[in-house]
């Protein structure tokens, strides 16, 4: 039995969906512990491309329980669309469970998110406009709506009376947005509650029953370490905690229940939205990485910013999450390059630093210090064993493992399930150096 957390070691979009899908084959329970529809993951099965925002990747395995935990925020309209899409693709959704205590994104959250971001002007932070920040803000202010409220007409009316009046006043008087019809909102969300009711459970009871039965539990994070509310590039962050510690809070488990933490990182770096990005590229190489990597956001459709692999934020992710091993994705995107650069340190105010600065202003002034490695200039897409990889590709992976000071367990070479080299099963295999310098 092993309980494993999968986190993003960069700014999100690292390929966690594919890695979680891969590991879900060995999991009895998959738990999404934070975030909302601001995250997206793509799973490719044969010719099927499934783009999900809320539903855990493990939904493709009929015997696996997929739990959306208390730390998430739920947009029921989006969730029901995803469920309908899965049913249309003949995917069994009976294993999906939703925490009754998860908070709900209401229509006023989306409207406020968009209005506030627009008002920020050139100080915008790059929000997805999906209402995530305002939903978490209401949660912190103890003014939020939870899934269980959608199951009781009287309770929902009582819970919404004050917030709806307050939000309508804000929308109308501050942002010039038309107010919402209270009765229409209530009826709409009661309808969502009726459809979701068969999936609503006590999250804590589900997880701890699985733990007592010595089941394998996989905790799936959204976004990435550098978007963490407390430990990311604040204020250019999300409104929750994607790091491994967030699994304990969002799922309701103690840290002693976690056996292993796996970090997912691209073989290069990407970022969506605003904020400093020291290794960001411009010109033809940026275009090449973006086009070959299909770097467009699953949630927003925005073109991702691309840059070289950043070992400084990588080491930071190892430390903050307590990573045991890494999964490196999209190695194949680098196949055509004659040389590849890796950031090993920064220069800040004329001094070399090897740590991640805590202020966004200092981070924006950091200049990357690179080491240049030779490329392999041949396709890796069909490699299925380490020994199939070109020597220079192996050297690159060893360099990353040495730089990050953590072994590599999985190498992904494309979107399909079979385009993967599993050096050692991270769930059942022993903790040992899998691919290291």
UniProtKB/Swiss-Prot annotation:
Gene3D superfamilies: Adenylosuccinate Synthetase, subunit A, domain 1, Adenylosuccinate Synthetase, subunit A, domain 2, Adenylosuccinate Synthetase, subunit A, domain 3. Pathway: Purine metabolism; AMP biosynthesis via de novo pathway; AMP from IMP: step 1/2. Keywords: Cytoplasm, GTP-binding, Ligase, Magnesium, Metal-binding, Nucleotide-binding, Purine biosynthesis. Substrate binds at residues 298-304. Binds 1 Mg(2+) ion per subunit. Its cofactor is Mg(2+). IMP binds at residues 13-16, 38-41, 128, 142, 223, 238, 302. Pfam families: Adenylsucc_synt. It is found in: Cytoplasm. It is an enzyme of class 6 (ligase). The active site is at 13 (proton acceptor), 41 (proton donor). Homodimer. Belongs to the adenylosuccinate synthetase family. This is Adenylosuccinate synthetase. The gene is purA.
């Amino acid at each position: 039995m092993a309980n494993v957390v999968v986190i993003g070691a960069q700014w999100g979009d690292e390929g966690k969906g594919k890695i979680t899908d891969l590991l879900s084959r060995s999991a009895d329970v998959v738990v999404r512990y934070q975030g909302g529809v601001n995250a997206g993951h793509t799973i490719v099965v044969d010719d099927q491309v499934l783009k999900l925002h809320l539903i855990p990747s493990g939904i493709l395995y009929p015997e696996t329980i997929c739990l959306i935990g208390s730390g998430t925020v739920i947009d029921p309209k989006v969730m029901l669309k995803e469920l309908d899409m899965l049913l249309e693709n003949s995917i069994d959704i009976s294993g999906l469970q939703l925490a009754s205590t998860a908070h709900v994104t209401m229509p006023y959250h989306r409207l406020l998110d968009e209005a506030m971001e627009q008002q920020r002007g050139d100080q915008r932070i790059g929000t997805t406009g999906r209402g995530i920040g305002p939903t978490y803000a209401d949660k912190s202010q103890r003014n939020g709506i939870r899934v269980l409220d959608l199951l009781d007409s009287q309770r929902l009316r009582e819970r919404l009376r004050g917030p709806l009046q307050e939000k309508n006043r804000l929308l109308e008087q501050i942002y010039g947005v038309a107010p919402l019809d209270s009765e229409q909102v209530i009826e709409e969300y009661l309808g969502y509650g009726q459809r979701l009711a068969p999936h609503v459970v006590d999250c804590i009871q589900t997880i701890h029953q699985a733990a007592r039965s010595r089941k394998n539990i996989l905790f799936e994070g959204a976004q990435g370490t550098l978007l963490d509310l407390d430990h990311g590039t604040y204020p250019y962050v999300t409104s929750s905690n994607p790091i491994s510690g967030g699994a304990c809070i969002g799922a309701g488990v103690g840290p002693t229940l976690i056996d292993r933490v796996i970090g997912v990182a691209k073989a290069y770096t990407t970022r969506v939205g605003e904020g400093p990005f020291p290794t960001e590229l411009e010109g033809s190489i940026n275009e090449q990485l973006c086009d070959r990597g299909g770097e467009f956001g699953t949630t927003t459709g925005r073109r991702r910013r691309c840059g070289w692999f950043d070992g400084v934020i990588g080491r930071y992710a190892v430390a903050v999450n307590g990573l045991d091993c890494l999964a490196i994705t999209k190695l194949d995107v680098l196949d055509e390059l004659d040389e590849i650069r890796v950031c090993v340190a920064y220069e800040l105010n004329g001094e070399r630093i090897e740590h991640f600065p805590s202020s966004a202003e200092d981070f924006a002034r950091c200049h990357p210090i690179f080491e240049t490695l030779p490329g392999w200039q041949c396709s890796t897409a069909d490699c299925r064993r380490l020994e199939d990889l070109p020597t220079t590709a192996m050297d690159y992976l060893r360099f990353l493992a040495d730089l990050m000071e953590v072994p590599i367990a999985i190498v992904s070479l494309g979107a399909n399930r079979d385009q993967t080299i599993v050096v050692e099963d991270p769930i059942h295999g022993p903790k040992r150096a899998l691919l290291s310098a």
